[in-house]
């Protein structure tokens, strides 16, 4: 005969199992699909053009566990006759979950010996009343100083901190969605100043504007893409 305690325990286990099943994502959202970042991001952006360079801090090392986070990456140096050079890294991962998630620059720069300071939120104005949240920070090593401006996209959300990123993933999980994600990072080697960060933001705005409307969701998600389209941008 099954006693009352066993019945209660069994009921609790069934409830827990049902809750776990409800929180198990079932729909995988991928905005890149079969396309390549190399083809999406123009080699000429405003009055900047790409030039070969090896001066990059990449978000992963080939063959490492973190390399599993990213299915596609692009690293380019853009130079301009009348502005600062801009190093651009775009890293895309088609799976964002508890085991695999984007590494924010605060993590990957610190991992190779940089000190992180002056981390502040900012925005790119993509069109009238259309703003993209970004984060600005300074990475310093013995050999160089890098002002950095970056954003991350998880599904259709644009978290600017690690805690926001974790909260977004939980919300997506509750909604039954397995999101993709992208890191877009712009930096230069210079002493940090308002003028330098302003140029990084200007480059970021020009980069989004230069990407075809059909490809913009890969970098900024469908909501901001639709808002830009509605604003005529």
Show which residues each predicted segment covers.
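Active-site-proximal structural scaffolding
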Residues: 12-13, 41, 200
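Short secondary-structure capping/turn segments at boundaries of alpha-helices and beta-strands
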Residues: 35-37, 60-65, 73-77
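A cross-kingdom signal targeting lumenal/periplasmic-facing segments of multi-pass membrane
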Residues: 68-202, 206-218, 222, 227-228
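N-terminal secretory signal peptides and thylakoid transit peptides that target proteins
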Residues: 1-15
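Membrane-interface motif at the C-terminal end of an N-terminal transmembrane signal
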Residues: 18-30
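Alpha-helical transmembrane signal-anchor/signal-peptide segments
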Residues: 28-41
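Short extracytoplasmic
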Residues: 41-67
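Short, solvent-exposed mixed-charge patches
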Residues: 232-233
